[in-house]
Amino acid sequence: MTGATPENRTAPSPPPVKHVPESVLPAKPPKRNNYAFACAILASMTSILLGYDIGVMSGAMIYIKRDLKINDLQIGILAGSLNIYSLIGSCAAGRTSDWIGRRYTIVLAGAIFFAGAILMGLSPNYAFLMFGRFIAGIGVGYALMIAPVYTAEVSPASSRGFLNSFPEVFINAGIMLGYVSNLAFSNLPLKVGWRLMLGIGAVPSVILAIGVLAMPESPRWLVMQGRLGDAKRVLDKTSDSPTEATLRLEDIKHAAGIPADCHDDVVQVSRRNSHGEGVWRELLIRPTPAVRRVMIAAIGIHFFQQASGIDAVVLFSPRIFKTAGLKTDHQQLLATVAVGVVKTSFILVATFLLDRIGRRPLLLTSVGGMVLSLAALGTSLTIIDQSEKKVMWAVVVAIATVMTYVATFSIGAGPITWVYSSEIFPLRLRSQGSSMGVVVNRVTSGVISISFLPMSKAMTTGGAFYLFGGIATVAWVFFYTFLPETQGRMLEDMDELFSGFRWRDSKSKPKGNPEKTVPNPEVEIGSNKQWKEGDTQSS
């Protein structure tokens, strides 16, 4: 047994630069790794749980309000409370996933959400319904944190952006399923329809829990447990080439503080390092400048993703369409299905652009489109609200700009938030750092969801969307200033990237020796560019 006891706060000095012969370089971009693709799909299916709840609640609220005779404040609390409850799961998920592994944490998320969905479907009153949402919220919190972390850790570098956008793809798929469920059960008796809408959400959680058992464990988690042999076998299956698998294993061992010359199948790893003691101190109390910048970037991108109002649009789209002039429940639910179709279609487009265009250009373009859409939506709703007669062109603009808003969100801000925040944290901080980002995401979403109806009454619905547009404008400036491009970077290279980033340098070149040869020609993140022997990177 070979022991390794690294300091928790200070990363080991970089290993000697590897000089890779040209003979090992692939002649063309690697083909998609189908095994890693399947693993990413199974892990990301956890996000269906949140998406379904958001989508189904948007329509179920109409019937819950009538059946249980509750007011708008109670409806807002019902809609937004799941996000607040999810904090428990998100806060616990980092430690849980380091303890039992990423895979069994996903199973746990599915089991908890299953119980919550059954309780909601059987709810006799408002209090019992809130209890069911409390249980489901914990499951959602676990799912939101663990899916992007697992996917980032199992994915080959050439397609990590593509694969790590899958959680957002499945959130959108879940929203779409929720909208369709609303439409399908809307004609049932009042007391039955909304309960079926909520209770049937237990079905995907069962499928998820069974499917996840076929997944391998994260290779990074295996290394943190000292199981190098198991990690190597997983990397051999999920990498684009044997050379990449070897180099990925060396990088992970280096980050975990395991000597490069250690080749045992099982080694002793410091318990403090593998289970997170000291991590919170490094994240919150005494962070290095690089870690501080990573924290600002991760928390900022999660905050602005939700503060720009996406969950208000998705949750309250029937109410928005009613304000825009669609009067019947059927018309409103059909329009929400259209929102789901647009949102899902554009997220699929985004998955193919992430590794071609890069995170930063796509994010800035997306948020710019959101600003324009929110301004037009706020203007059209204000005109409708102030006019005594129906202004048909304003109705058309309002409906169209809801669609353009969710489209521009889905092509950038939606998927990139999860991709970016899951790949920028160093290995030793990844679980806890990612869980903090999810906490901020869910708190912001909960506040927006709970306050949207009171805010709409206080400043009109159009005024609320002007406010969201202003926040999105601030978000664009923040992203331009503080978020470097991570395309073309190894996961273990993020410390160097954030140590040297300056906002004027959009290419985010790292500091270093200009004579330094790129150490890993096959694992450039999200890029098909291949480095030849002797190529250099300078600051």
Swiss-Prot record:
Cited SUPFAM superfamilies: MFS general substrate transporter (SSF103473)
Inducing factors: By wounding and insect feeding.
UniProt keyword list: Cell membrane, Membrane, Sugar transport, Symport, Transmembrane, Transmembrane helix, Transport
CDD domains xrefs: MFS_PLT
Biased composition (Basic and acidic residues): 503-514, 530-539
Localization per record: Cell membrane
Keyword check for Nucleotidyltransferase: no
Tissue expression pattern: Highly expressed in roots. Expressed in vascular tissue of leaves, sepals and siliques.
Record-level Gene Ontology MF annotations: carbohydrate:proton symporter activity; D-ribose transmembrane transporter activity; D-xylose transmembrane transporter activity; galactose transmembrane transporter activity; glycerol transmembrane transporter activity; mannitol transmembrane transporter activity; monosaccharide transmembrane transporter activity; myo-inositol transmembrane transporter activity
One Gene Ontology cellular component annotation held by this UniProt entry: plasma membrane
Swiss-Prot/TrEMBL GO biological process terms: lateral root formation
Segments crossing the lipid bilayer: 37-57, 73-93, 104-124, 127-147, 165-185, 196-216, 296-316, 333-353, 364-384, 391-411, 433-453, 463-483
Residue ranges with Polar residues bias: 1-11
Chain residue ranges for the region called Disordered: 1-24, 503-539
pH dependence remark: Optimum extracellular pH is 4.5 for sorbitol as substrate.
Topological category with respect to the lipid bilayer: Multi-pass membrane protein
Function of the molecule: Plasma membrane broad-spectrum sugar-proton symporter. Mediates the uptake of linear polyols such as sorbitol, xylitol, erythritol or glycerol. Can transport the cyclic polyol myo-inositol and different hexoses, pentoses (including ribose), tetroses and sugar alcohols.
Sequence similarity: Belongs to the major facilitator superfamily. Sugar transporter (TC 2.A.1.1) family.
Name of this protein: Polyol transporter 5
Lineage per the UniProt record: Eukaryota, Viridiplantae, Streptophyta, Embryophyta, Tracheophyta
GN (gene name): PLT5
